[in-house]
Structure formats: C-alpha cells, structure tokens
C-alpha cells in the first residue's frame, strides 16, 4: 500500500516552522508580502520570505530574524542582528531609508521587464546606468507637505560613481525626454533644475550637492537639502536601515491598508538588515531586526 509522506522542510522554512511552534513569531512568503505592500512590493525584493521572533523591551515591540530574496533556500541561519536603539523621528519626516548600495532598493524594479522598459524609454535608465548606480550609497526621504497639491515630497540622495560627464549627459537626455512629455524646465538656483506642469506646479527635479552627490526630488522643491560633505550619514554596521511613522503615513493615505493593525497604529517603526556575504546564499540572505513604538 502506497502512502504519501510530506518531505520535511529544510533551511529557512524549517527554522521558521520551528520558531512558530516554540515562540511568538511571524512567518511570511512573497505572495503574502505582495498582498500587504501592494504597489510598494517591488521595493521589498530582499524580503521575499522570512520569519521574525517577537518580544517586548520597555514598552516597545522588538524583533530579530532572517529574510531571503529567494524562496526555498537551504542555507544555514545568518548571524544574529541586535534590534536597533530607539531613534525618534519627528514631523515633517514620514520615512527615511538609508542603504549602502542602491541595488538593494532597485533590484525589484530591475527584475520586472515592464518596469525596466518603461524606465529606459521614459527616463533613459538603461543597462549602463543601472550598472553604475547599483553600488552607490543612498538616502531616501519622504517628508509631509502641509500646503500645496502634494501630500508629501520625496528625495533620493545618491553618491554617484566617478565620471561626472557621464551623468551630465544622462541628465541632458533625461531633460529632453521630460520636455517631450510636456514638462517645463526651470533653474531657480545654481545647480538646481526643477520641472513643472504648464500650470506652473513644480513636480520634481534634481540638484547637484557636490561633484558626485546628486539629489532627485518628486514634488515641490525641498525646503531643506541634505549636507554636501564627503559622505552621507549611512549606517556602517548594517546594509540598510528604515525608519517610518506609520500613523502619520496612514493619516495622509500613504500607508498600504493591508498592513497589520498594530503597524498602522504605531507611532514609529524601525527595520534594518545586514546581508550575509559569501557562502551558499549568494548575497540573497539577510539578518533582520527592528523595533515598533505605539507611543
């Protein structure tokens, strides 16, 4: 008589199953994550599956665990990553993401042939631009706008690789593409280029902060710009760090509604990750940790 036997889970799945049976924990896969994040899902390519152990710390919810960009990996667990210390975030900041490599943010976009084609045709982001950008340190910031047509403004600061001429040529090509799309170019300040609709509403632009540091912005011209010193304040002990104010984001309808209620009601959330370099994971495996504050 034949009988079906389920093959024991291995690797990350096995560890996550064991954690769920023994501790307070959460376990997710790529489908569940995409359902929760909606249109933001392409930016979570590093976190396609994983699990977190939950605990409390002086009124905070903290977690540690692991995530992987590839489903079904059989690698050993990555090194433990301690939860971040409290780092208050105040208005008008809504979100701050710092990373050591821009491809940590963009690899999900580049994996989609439709998005890749759109970015190449409309904004000139072809294979050579992707190749040069992927190793660049970056800071992404979302700030609430109290007035005007936008609920928030977005800034992306990147320390570009050498060859200023290459980037100047790309910005010139991008300018021609934006003009063909009906936008009007302005230069209100030195090294600052803004773009507006025919009705005069500024919708974005860029500014050189230093020889290799460029800030792109969507929305109005930022009231304050990041420093132009030799290095951005990027965390060196992790590969990326995210801070956000979920409650404030929800109030301006910028937080995905399917996120868990405890996240939506939180005053602040911190999440960070460190890639496991070398070994069998091929750079897809991460240690992750975080902190949530309800007050």
Place the predicted regions along the sequence by residue:
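Single conserved position on a long alpha-helix in the C-terminal lobe of the eukaryotic protein kinase
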Residues: 1-17, 139-241
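Leucine-rich, highly hydrophobic segment in Treponema pallidum outer-membrane-associated proteins
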Residues: 6-109, 243-295
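Proline-rich intrinsically disordered, low-complexity coils
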Residues: 8, 39-42, 78, 83-84, ...
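Generic secondary-structure transition motif, activating predominantly at the C-termini of alpha-helices
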Residues: 16, 20, 32, 41, ...
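Short, low-complexity intrinsically disordered segments
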Residues: 26, 31-34, 61, 78, ...
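Generic detector of solvent-exposed, compositionally biased contiguous segments
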Residues: 34-45, 114-130, 187-202, 257-265
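Extracytoplasmic/luminal low-complexity segments enriched in Pro/Gly and acidic/polar residues
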Residues: 63, 69-180
């Amino acid at each position: 008589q034949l009988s079906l036997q389920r093959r024991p889970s291995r690797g990350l799945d096995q560890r996550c199953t064991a954690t769920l049976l023994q501790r307070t924990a959460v376990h997710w896969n790529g489908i569940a994550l995409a359902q929760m994040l909606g249109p933001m899902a392409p930016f979570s390519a590093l976190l396609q599956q994983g699990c977190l152990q939950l605990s409390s710390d002086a009124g905070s919810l903290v977690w540690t665990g692991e995530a992987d960009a590839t489903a079904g990996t059989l690698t050993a667990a990555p090194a433990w990553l301690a939860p971040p210390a409290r780092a208050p975030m105040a208005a008008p900041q809504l979100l701050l993401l710092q990373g050591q490599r821009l491809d940590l943010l963009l690899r999900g976009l580049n994996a989609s042939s439709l998005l890749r084609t759109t970015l190449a045709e409309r904004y000139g982001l072809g294979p050579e631009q992707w190749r040069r950008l992927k190793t660049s340190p970056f800071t992404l910031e979302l700030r609430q706008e109290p007035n005007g047509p936008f609920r928030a403004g977005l800034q992306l600061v990147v320390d570009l690789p050498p060859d200023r001429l290459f980037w100047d040529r790309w910005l010139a090509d991008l300018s021609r593409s934006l003009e063909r799309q009906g936008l009007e170019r302005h230069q209100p300040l030195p090294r600052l280029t803004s773009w507006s609709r025919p009705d005069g509403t500024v919708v974005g632009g860029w500014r050189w902060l230093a020889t290799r540091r460029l800030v792109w912005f969507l929305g109005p011209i930022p009231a304050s710009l990041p420093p132009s010193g030799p290095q951005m304040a990027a965390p060196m002990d992790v590969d990326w760090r995210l801070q956000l104010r979920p409650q404030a984001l929800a109030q301006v309808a910028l937080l995905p509604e399917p996120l868990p209620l405890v996240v939506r009601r939180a005053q602040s959330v911190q999440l960070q990750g460190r890639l496991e370099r070398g070994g069998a994971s091929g750079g897809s495996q991460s240690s992750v940790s975080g902190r949530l504050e309800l007050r």
